[in-house]
Amino acid sequence: AGLSKKRESYSADHVAVYVSDLWQANDRLFITPSLRFEHHNRFGSSLSPRLGLTYEPDSHTRFKVNYGKGFKAPTISELYIKLHHFVNVYGNPDLEPETSRSWDAGVEWERGKSFGRVTYFDNHVKNLIDAKPSGRNNDWFYQNIRRGDIRGVESEWGYRVSDRLTFKASHVYLDAKGAMIGKMKARLDNRARNTFTAIILYDDHEKYGWSGS
């Protein structure tokens, strides 16, 4: 007798079109409207508008505000995956697409050799797709969380040591909570509250044809 393994194949048709424009209200104020159209053969069509404002009081400072809506269909993996490893992960063919409303506001600046930015973001997601533990045998299943509230602050500071060498350090504070039907909000899994990053970038400006970080 031999061993046989059945391979399952899945596919999806997903088309997206994105258009954007830049309007200059005056020398300091810029408006960026955009629109994204998506069609999924299973989940239908959606329109996601977005509007951004940028104000530049001087040549070294920019204030930015953005607001928009979003749509995200489940991926093939989220729908059908069957992964058996240290942790078993299973898809869910009954998943619904995510819809979201989000806004952010921040400031960017440059002073001499230093530069930086700070941005606050606030996202509200309906039917957030997330993998949750089942409570037995290290099994995780993708499911929809009725509502996800993801907000936080991103900050970055950099210094140009020379025309080829740049140092950058960043920090992200994340407050990510979700609520199932009939349950109180709880912190979402696998999302670090604080993330720190530091990198050194080198660019030889094509003298030798390489760059690194």
Predicted features, each with a name:
Residues 39-41, 55, 177:
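Short, solvent-exposed loop/turn segments at secondary-structure junctions
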Residues 24-27, 31, 121-124, 143-213:
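Gram-negative outer-membrane beta-barrel transporters
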Residues 1-5, 43-48, 77-82, 90, ...:
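Outer-membrane beta-barrel translocator domains and adjoining extracellular loop/strand segments
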Residues 24, 30, 52, 56, ...:
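Membrane-spanning beta-strand positions in outer-membrane beta-barrel proteins
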Residues 1, 33-37, 65-69, 78, ...:
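Transmembrane beta-barrel strands of outer-membrane/channel proteins
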Residues 10-12, 56, 60-62, 69-125, ...:
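Outer-membrane beta-barrel signature, preferentially recognizing the C-terminal barrel domain
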Residues 8-40, 46-50, 165-170:
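Surface-exposed extracellular loop regions of Gram-negative outer-membrane beta-barrel proteins
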Residues 43-45, 61, 75, 115-117, ...:
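Short acidic, gly/pro-rich beta-turn/loop elements at beta-sheet edges
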